[in-house]
Amino acid sequence: MFDAFTKVVAQADARGQFISASEIDALAAMVSDSNKRLDAVNRISSNASTIVASAARQLFAQQPSLIAPGGNAYTSRRMAACLRDMEIILRYVTYASFAGDASVLEDRCLNGLRETYLALGTPGASVAAGVNLMKESALAIVNDRAGISAGDCASLSSEIGTYFDRAAAAVA
């Protein structure tokens, strides 16, 4: 996993060049937005159980066959596994959001996840729908202006959304 700074240094080193002005500008913008980033990650982390529970409730309301006898989330053990997986994905989205880089999400969470779900018979489309529901809930919390650093969060919100999109695409 690389944070944004380490990634820029590694790329410049691989090119055998100094860090470019545009790379420095991009990192400077990230630093100037760091309080917003920390606020966003803190808000998602502090509301993780609510985000997961809300997404699960909505998912099971939309796809009741998942919790019906024979469904993939039927029995408390399977339901717990589903909620655990949603929480793990959300946790890695927060790591990527904090670092400003998706590599931790890709390398430690999503790599091989689709294959695992296929082997277990877990419907990837349902997992992707759950991830998208978590995205909606998390972004609503991030975009709530009450009690956070002043400023436009559109860019950060968009970035966080892409991490959820990567997760949904990886399992669909």
UniProtKB/Swiss-Prot annotation:
Belongs to the phycobiliprotein family. It comes from Synechococcus sp. (strain WH7803). This is R-phycocyanin beta subunit. One of its GO terms (biological process) is photosynthesis. The gene is rpcB. Contains two covalently linked bilin chromophores. InterPro entries: Globin-like_sf, Phycobilisome_asu/bsu, Phycobilisome_asu/bsu_sf, Phycocyanin_b. Heterodimer of an alpha and a beta subunit, which further assembles into trimers and the trimers into hexamers. The lineage of its organism: Bacteria, Bacillati, Cyanobacteriota, Cyanophyceae, Synechococcales. The keyword Electron transport applies. GO terms for cellular component: phycobilisome; plasma membrane-derived thylakoid membrane. It is a peripheral membrane protein.
